[in-house]
Amino acid sequence: VEEELTYIKNYCRIMNYRYGEKTVLGIEADSSLMSAMVPKFILQPLVENSFFHGLAEKEMQEHKKFQIYVKGKRKEYKTRDCLELCVYDNGIGISRENCEKLRAILNMEDDGRHIGLRNIYQRIKLLYDMENGVEIGSDNENGFQVLVRIPYEEEKW
């Protein structure tokens, strides 16, 4: 987890150069989670999507801060000890209808769109045999969130 958080911190630093320090990254995760094992680049595509889809030029012109949060926690889910990583933002969000369409797209064949999200979903499904390893939600015009759930495993040294 620690390595993945470093990747997204660096990515957000780059985006701050691009947008002039108008983005904020918040991370909330217990230090005990830092040694948890996660697939490589499981979070960065979600943060990239937040910038690409959630950040409206209008917000930048109105001098609003674009905020992205990553929250990690260990939680039991269906009798499994799991790691939940949630990436959410205060961007423009999507409608309930479009959110449902996006959920349906996860299981469809590649059409060249939603590559990052579909890739994360399929990797979790293949690696952990979890059909519900990715959950998508939106508060219409007040942001978007993606929850990634995988079995909790400590890094072995």
Name each model feature, range by range.
Residues 151-155:
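Two-component histidine kinase transmitter core
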